[in-house]
Regions:
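Structured, active/binding-site neighborhoods that engage oxygen-rich ligands
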Residues: 1-373
Length: 373
């Protein structure tokens, strides 16, 4: 790699600042998409666009406006936010942090399964995660949550009809944030988490998102995309989705083109949503509001895509506009057992500490051995 293509790997203070912006971006993007998530998934893009227009939220560059009778969640709408409301996307990010604090680079899929049983309410899981959870409850040894062996093959948990949907992808971001310049390690950590519930493209989507977050700390955005793609098979559907989204960057009709390309795919699929993420991010690398706004306005899984774009945009290091962060006041509500609310400051401090600990330990295992030099 030509040295002119590199950005300097971050100092501890700069790393902390990037991680803060990643959390700010992820939480803000999630809260932007959360009010219209069900509207988008159940009624489609036309209904989403009609609603946004009716509340003067197009182009989408601020939190969504609210009107009654539309099935929209008011707590996350413009003028209503007082904290980040609980959401599974943020639950999984905090759960990944909890796992890394305890296991670091030695994290295993069994560790993830135990954490689910101990901390993640079954009612807060959906599709592939709920199917995997059900298998754990039915087949795992009663002592498994407390450290015993599972007593069955954990790969049975991912044998479900949703294993190529978006669930694993939304669990992956933090693995990238704590591995700056190490996309291989980030992808491997995300893989170990993802394989509990997902297979094939469902896993590759998680690996790609984690790897991209890690690579953005070390190289320019264009090169980061290439390094993240190195972590997954070139022929995978995820790789094709990434190339589609990147190829449509700066095309104002990119969202429509992606929806048409994946017509018939579930609105919570991995491929269509990842293509939206890449398109929105790479169309607006210098404009946070436009990046998350276009990701959400494009439809499909709006809170997931807003969150993923927001976190990836933030990890680059540029400041998140205060119009997005001020309304939720550094308060992050959760739906994890024993964890009702946490502060942004605590998340930043804990995540930075994990990242520095991983750096002190060295690179650690990397499945594909393609971290940055």
């Amino acid at each position: 790699m030509d040295s002119s293509e590199r950005k300097p790997l971050v100092t501890p203070d700069a790393l902390s600042a990037r991680i803060r912006r990643a959390w700010e971006g992820r939480i803000s993007g999630c809260q932007l998409g959360k009010p219209v998530e069900l509207l988008s998934m159940r009624e489609g893009h036309e209904a989403l666009t009609s609603y946004l227009a009716s509340v003067d939220s197009l182009p989408l560059r601020d939190y969504v406006g609210y009107r009654t009778g539309a099935g929209v969640q008011p707590a996350c709408c413009r003028g209503q936010l007082t904290r980040s409301e609980p959401d599974d996307d943020i639950n999984y990010s905090v759960l990944a942090l909890w796992l890394l604090e305890r296991h670091g680079a030695q994290l295993t899929t069994a560790d993830v399964a135990r954490a689910w049983l101990n901390l993640l309410p079954a009612g807060a899981t959906f599709t592939a995660e709920r199917a995997a959870y059900r298998v754990l409850l039915e087949h795992a040894d009663d002592r498994f949550p407390h450290g015993a062996e599972a007593g069955f093959d954990l790969s049975e948990c991912s044998d479900n009809p949703y294993n190529d949907w978006i669930g694993a992808q939304i669990r992956a971001d933090v693995y990238g944030w704590v591995c700056p310049g190490q996309p291989g390690l980030a992808a491997e950590l995300a893989r170990r988490d993802a394989t509990l519930s997902h297979r094939d493209d469902g896993v590759y989507g998680a690996m790609f998102v984690a790897a991209l977050g890690a690579a953005l700390a070390g190289v320019t955005p264009g090169n980061a995309l290439a390094h993240a793609l190195e972590q997954i098979p070139a022929e995978a559907g995820v790789a094709q989705a990434v190339r589609l989204g990147a190829g449509l960057a700066h095309d104002v009709d990119g969202g429509a083109a992606i929806r048409a390309h994946y017509d018939g795919l579930s609105p919570v699929g991995t491929l269509n949503n990842l293509a939206i993420v890449v398109w929105a991010l790479y169309s607006h690398l210098d404009d946070f509001s436009a990046a998350i706004g276009e990701a959400v306005a494009a439809g499909l899984d709006t809170d997931c895509n807003g969150a993923t774009v927001g976190g990836l945009w933030g990890i680059q290091g540029d400041a998140i506009p205060t119009q997005w962060t001020a309304p939720w006041q550094g308060r992050v509500a959760l739906g994890l057992a024993g964890h009702d609310e946490v502060t942004l400051a605590a998340l930043v401090e804990r995540t930075t500490r994990v990242a520095l600990a991983l750096a002190d330990q060295g690179q650690g295992p990397s499945r594909r051995k393609k971290d940055l030099p």
